[in-house]
UniProtKB/Swiss-Prot annotation:
Keywords associated with the record: ATP-binding, DNA damage, DNA repair, DNA-binding, Nucleotide-binding
4Fe-4S keyword on record: no
SUPFAM superfamilies assigned: DNA repair protein MutS, domain I, DNA repair protein MutS, domain II, DNA repair protein MutS, domain III, P-loop containing nucleoside triphosphate hydrolases
Annotated organism of origin: Variovorax paradoxus (strain S110)
Name under which the protein is recorded: DNA mismatch repair protein MutS
A GO BP entry: mismatch repair
Highest taxon, organism lineage: Bacteria
GO annotations of cellular component type: cytosol
Amino acid sequence: MKTTTAQPSPSTSDFSGHTPMMAQYLGLKANHPDTLLFYRMGDFYELFWADAEKAARLLDITLTQRGQSAGQPVVMCGVPFHAVDTYLARLIKLGESVAICEQVGEVGASKGPVERKVVRVVTPGTLTDSELLNDKSESLLLAVHAGTRNFCGLAWLSVTGAELRLAECPADALEAWIARIAPSELLYSAEVTPAFEQRLKAARAATPFTLSIRPAWQFDGGLGERKLSEQMGSNSLAAWNAESLANAHAAAAALLGYAEHTQGRALSHVQRLSVERDGDLVELPPTTRRNLELVQTLRGEDSPTLFSLLDTCMTGMGSRLLKRWLLSPRRDRGEAQARLEAIAALQSTVLGGTAAPWRTLREQLKNTSDVERIAARIALRQVRPRELLALRLALAKAEQLAPALPASGELLGGIIERLAPPSGCADLLASAIKPDPSALVRDGGVIATGHDAELDELRAISENCDDFLLKLEVSERERTGISNLRVQFNRVHGFYIEVTQSALSKVPDNYRRRQTLKNAERFITPELKAFEDKALSAQDRALAREKWLYEQLLDALQPSVPALTQLAGAIATLDALCALAERSHTLHWRAPSFVSHPCIEIQQGRHPVVEARLAEKSSGGFIANDTQLGPQQRMQVITGPNMGGKSTYMRQVAIIVLLASIGSHVPAAACRLGPIDAIHTRIGAADDLANAQSTFMLEMTEAAQILHSATAQSLVLMDEIGRGTSTFDGLALAAGIAAQLHDRSKAFTLFATHYFELTEFPATHHCAVNMHVSATEAGRDIVFLHEMQPGPASKSYGIQVARLAGMPAAVVNHARQALEALESQHAQTRAQVDLFAPPPAAETPMASAVESALAALDPDAMTPREALDALYALQKLNTRERGAA
């Protein structure tokens, strides 16, 4: 990459001495000091000084130098306007923000540079362009307020969505909330404590996002409440149960202010408000989402995951909604039950053997455009002509959906009601937009013929130019008798009549010479000059007229935005339900049933992703297994060889519970599920070097979090806990953790271990049972049967697994001999230690003199003076005690 010597940016407060254009640039840059400013100049967006150096480095484009301003070299680089989306995408991916500055004035309309202004700011959390967005994922902007009373306020939205969400969470749960929301950008106050800021930065390790600092005054609860009321068009937030959330209101104030600033206007399309509270959702900590590979594999890939298996949606709207369902299962079974009933209706076939409704509906949904995002871009006045054409086609498709939809149940009935397109919208789009419009309004060719008489006339002048010239040429030849006279046009000299040297004597008096050539002369006539003025201006006037008409069209579409947003929600819900119906049919899943008593009962359960991968590779069928957990059997202690299927079994149970909780059918012959409040997992191990945490430290940290959080309604997966330290340490810790989960948390627990000593745990803990994954030996080889069977495993088969992995024969033989010696020695010296005995009760310490004196005080009966005297007395007593000690 070509570079020049780095130059500091000029002062943005003193523009004296700068050229008019650079003074204009610096004035705009002063309002966006921390943002790259794309300054439109003709066919390029230019960047100057420090912005240019940064952009050139990040984008690997040429950095150059052109002239001077105020005695300083003007360092610059640029990108073509027609390719700007490509460069924006690269910058946004790097966490940068870009202010887009356009020419808004007419060239030559005033002295000095053409008028320019920043029309929008593109940041990672406020993306609106379809080229910059992922069809299947929301780009969320989150604001966090440090809050009071040890609570944090959160407010978040997608600028291209229609819903704003609020929450207040305990300060110690903030990281979990951030991880679940998974924002693209997080806003926080410039006046938070260093410790709080460090927590936000640390949270990026689990969920990468851009941090943006905002002035503290923007986080104002009163301002937020007013903004929310205005946004919802109401004097009170009581209808949304959002009136007493001062911390969340403060976050919403900053959120809305920032979003409006970046878009250059209010978010009129955001008209839904919801409040999420602790206890509403089934908790899925970051470790659970990672270990179950819900939306990303352990290698960071998008497939194969549970979401990639589920997502056969026909629209981006449906995919995004399905992902939200998957990551936000609700404890209240009402929504899940409604979805199960809807899936049943979509799968039912009417008498006569016609196709199930989900098949017909999916065909109709195919190629439906993203109505949700198009509606948002209409409201933000950023929609492109071809998106409006796509919207018209989507509205036509929507009209076909309701008749094919069974009116069964409240959920499907509500979808039918919301599928009604806004009145007159499709007709307006059909009359206004060409069937094949240009990509951009600035290119013309967008407004349909017949929509505006003045535009049609201007187009006719421009389009009929060739016909006029041909007719003029014929008439002039007849009038002058010059047979080779030609009427033509070029961009330099405009329209002209060309006559060869031999015919110049026949040129009429009204011909005025325009250009002399070697063998000919070119002339202009008053008639041709008048046409030239009209024709050349007609194209510019037609383009200006089209731009004006397009703005008028956007004005006319604004009242339809709420109905379009409602329609988008209905299409998304229907699409997601049809995808679940298709998955159930194709993968042979069954509907779960919900019960009020605690249980997880699964017959012939399967891991859906592993099963699908086996089918792809033709590697044989998946071995299904039963699971029985209830009040009398809350824990399974699972033993068996590596590669035997312990982790797969544990994960499949969690996935089946999760799928049932979102209202999906499940990969099992049958499933009964009681109340579930969380799914916790401690599976696998990896160092966190960035945060100076070893494998074992991470293991213990995650286990501690589970022990503090798990309840009797939680599902806990513990896989090989205690591996990262010495054998005795690990065994002792594993025993203690198992006892805590069994005796105190009473959570449904799948506890996989290689510590054979733990198979004695169920003997003293009546709600625990031993289970093992079966395997058999064939000579010196091992055959994995992948079946869960009662009782402990007879051996771990570690040496056989090492042999299968390709370990050198000498190493395997040495290990086998060493194992035999160790087992013999262990059998002779094994101590009878009760790993599962409760710890001895701690002695109750005697109360100190200070504690006794403090307990004797009655603060309510004391005057302020008496309280102060008592405090001094306690201080003296404490000093004496410390001295005696």
